[in-house]
Amino acid sequence: AMQRWNLHRRVAIGLIGLLGTKPSAIIAGFLMASALVSMWVSNTATALMMLPIALSVVQLLPERAHQTREVQGFSTALLLSVAYGATTGGMGTLIGTPPNALLAGYIADIHDVTIGFGQWMLIGVPVVLVALPAVYVVLTRIMFTLDAGELPGMAELIKAEKAAQGRMGRAEIAVAVVF
């Protein structure tokens, strides 16, 4: 639904406009957004929801830029940030990923110890808060060197895209409310 009404494109443009056009800032935004959503929605569903948004960011890049090594590294890091952010965020709550609930059920059955939602979060959220910066450093400093400045032509492209989009339609609003 997000793709049908181009809401994913609007979200991507808004996210970049908010965070700036530096690759490392965009990676941080996608990591945090994926992790936050994944704490309350299955990590698989989160990745499926965020992937079209990340792909639309990659598609916003000028065609000539796709051939540079920096942009290829950014594109790969961006897609990995969705996957890693969703996986990391899913550890934060019982409902973030199905194995969490399975583990809680197993512990309740075998050891007669009940782990509540809040109890899980007392351990899970600090783990997420420590893991996310580590993932960010790995993606932006170790695997890919992304602080080479802003993406070429991205600021002008964002302005043009925002102007071309206009106001949100009813269908976009309905999809945004559902998600």
Predicted regions and their residues:
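Membrane-embedded alpha-helical segments and adjacent helix-loop junctions characteristic
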Residues: 1-69
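Juxtamembrane and boundary regions of transmembrane helices in multi-pass small-molecule transporters
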Residues: 4-10, 43, 61-103, 109-167, ...
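Transmembrane helical segments that form the transport core of multi-pass membrane transport proteins
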Residues: 30, 174-179
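Residues on a specific face of well-ordered alpha-helices
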Residues: 52-55, 101, 105
